[in-house]
């Protein structure tokens, strides 16, 4: 079993870093009012209730906050905060997680008589339309919080969302989900990234449908999970990744830095549930892809091409933090140290780019996401996205407490 010491790090230093990062959510990045104040909403997201949402974007040069998709970002932050609470016992983290979950529960269809009952308003690329992936990616935080608090309300919201997704978004028998839903017309519309012949995407994110099956015993959830996994095995290219599907760019051969995490990591869950090694082999290929894409200093870039070349700017620290979670889970299954060196480089890189003593108080504790290309001025090129800090907290919490590494064991 991998420990902090195996990475050449001191446990108290990793713990201190994780606590500082979690405090960034609880004390700095979380909206504390029902309406927006200092934050900008450039995408004109139609949320009516903002309290508890994580302000996910911070442009250091302008000192401005904004949002991209606060539903799924907040859901993942809730998961990070619950994990940080379990590791530390700091009540502030659990309170912040509850506040984040309240935002999600407010922003959904909660009337059982409404045809869209269970729908969560995961506004993302279009301010008036819901991304299917955003719904899926917000749910794990609710599962973690339900277990931590004993409050079944959160699990009930997960099941209601899965019912909506299974009936409205999933294309039966295909492993494909329709992507973008307009609640005002109650219809799916073309995604901004639509390509001819691409009906949707095989969304396996967080293995949520398998977790839903393990919680409820509903065979339909399990069927959807495995049909999606099979579709991903069919369409996998390059090994351990999926350039065919957005947000990767098949025309230019650009791979998204978290795709191998969203779709490769649940293959570990498929293996643990089914005992079929072909799923584990796919997860290993995803883990191996990350070792090849990782830069020598431990980081990762937003635009990594199929040939593993990159651009000079546009780092994406969240990608290597996600890789760390996958590597930890794979080594837990293997019982060996296959990914120890890449994991060591990744955690040390994240710790190096953490703001521990900034002059700007909005930055304290967060992980630097990316360095923007020059624009002709001498303004700070730093850009903060909450995702780097979210997945860093998740990764370090799992590193510090091994019992949280294999998630389907926790349902």
Segments the model singles out, each with a brief description of its role:
Residues 1-411:
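Glycan-recognition and catalytic cores of secretory/periplasmic carbohydrate-active enzymes
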């Amino acid at each position: 079993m991998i420990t902090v010491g195996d990475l050449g790090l001191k446990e108290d230093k990793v713990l201190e870093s994780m606590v500082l990062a979690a405090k960034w959510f609880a004390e700095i990045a979380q909206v504390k009012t029902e309406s927006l104040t200092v934050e900008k909403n450039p995408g004109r997201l139609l949320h009516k209730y903002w309290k508890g949402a994580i302000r996910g974007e911070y442009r250091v040069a302008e000192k401005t906050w904004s949002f991209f998709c606060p539903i799924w970002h907040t859901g993942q932050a809730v998961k990070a905060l619950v994990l940080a609470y379990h590791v530390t016992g700091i009540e502030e983290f659990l309170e912040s997680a509850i506040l984040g979950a309240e935002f999600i529960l407010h922003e959904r269809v909660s009337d059982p008589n409404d045809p869209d009952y269970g729908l969560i308003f995961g506004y993302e690329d279009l301010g008036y339309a819901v991304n299917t992936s955003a719904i899926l990616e917000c749910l794990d935080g609710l599962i973690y919080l339900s277990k931590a608090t004993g409050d079944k309300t959160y699990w009930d919201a997960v099941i209601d969302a899965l019912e909506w997704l299974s009936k409205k978004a999933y294309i039966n028998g295909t492993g494909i989900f329709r992507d973008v839903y307009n609640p005002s017309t109650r219809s799916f519309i073309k995604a901004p990234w639509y390509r001819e012949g691409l009906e949707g995407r095989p969304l396996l994110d967080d293995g949520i449908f398998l977790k839903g099956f393990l919680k409820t015993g509903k065979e339909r959830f399990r069927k959807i999970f495995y049909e999606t996994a099979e579709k991903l095995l069919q369409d996998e290219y390059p090994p351990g990744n999926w350039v065919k599907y957005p947000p990767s760019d098949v025309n230019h051969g650009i791979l998204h830095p978290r795709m191998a995490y969203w779709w490769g990591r649940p293959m570990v869950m498929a293996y643990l549930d089914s005992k079929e090694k072909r799923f584990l082999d796919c997860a290993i290929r995803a883990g191996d892809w990350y070792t090849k894409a990782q830069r020598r200093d431990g980081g990762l870039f937003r635009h990594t091409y199929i040939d593993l070349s990159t651009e000079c700017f546009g780092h994406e620290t969240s990608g290597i933090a996600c890789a760390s979670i996958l590597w930890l889970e794979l080594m837990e299954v293997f019982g060996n140290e296959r990914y120890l060196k890449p994991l060591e480089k990744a955690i040390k890189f994240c710790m190096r780019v953490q703001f521990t003593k900034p002059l700007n108080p909005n930055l304290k504790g967060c992980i630097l996401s990316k360095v923007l290309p020059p624009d002709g001025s001498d303004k700070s090129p730093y850009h903060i996205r909450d995702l780097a800090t979210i997945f860093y907290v998740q990764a370090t919490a799992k590193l510090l407490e091994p019992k949280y590494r294999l998630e389907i064991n926790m349902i």
